[in-house]
């Protein structure tokens, strides 16, 4: 059934504190917008500056993010970039294990999300490696066992909107109304997750995934509408093509555009989590926006 939206109720919004139960039983409360730092233990992610493929590079990346004040680390061992090399489950697990060992040597308190669409990878990352959150770009569509695993390990789940898979997702950009259709599709999945007993869910509109340039900015403009789910909202636009195509530059030059969108997402859209390559810049955005909000 299509979602009925009263647009007047959601013209703008602000950050709402939220809590999540971690697999180890901890209840973690987040009182301000969170900065999620990207750790790609891959050789072929779209932004070269995010690639940390050997132990020394991973060590340096983790140390830098921690020094810059990262709140959550998002580790991925399989690039979702179109055209990326296929990676076996065994290789993805090997990469993640290497990265998780280094992360947990540096910190045991900061939550770690594992960026994977494979249920067995998610299970082992949570139950054996010490990850806390499952970040699934497919929303459960690429592995039918994913939600069963998330329920069994009692992990918070990032539900992202995407149609198809990273190779063919741009073949599925036909929407009657992009925001309403994305909301409706996410709403259907939320109902299924609720039936399975999965409660701690973060919503990701899926910027850049099965959306055209114009559709990405329509979603950004309509971000307040995503609060109808009363869930934390993750925004992942860091150095993506929705920035580089509009500004005619490259991902290496995408920090200014990323900062602009993150500011809009926080100030106008009430974003809960910013997923970024550049932790220090995002922390500054959060600090400025929070100071502005709380000023008399």
Feature locations, PLM:
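Active-site-adjacent loop and "lid" segments of alpha/beta metabolic enzymes
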Residues: 6-15, 20-24, 30, 45-64, ...
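Hydrophobic "anchor" residues on beta-strands that sit immediately upstream
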Residues: 36, 70, 111, 131-132, ...
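Catalytic domains of carbohydrate-active enzymes, especially glycoside hydrolases
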Residues: 60-76
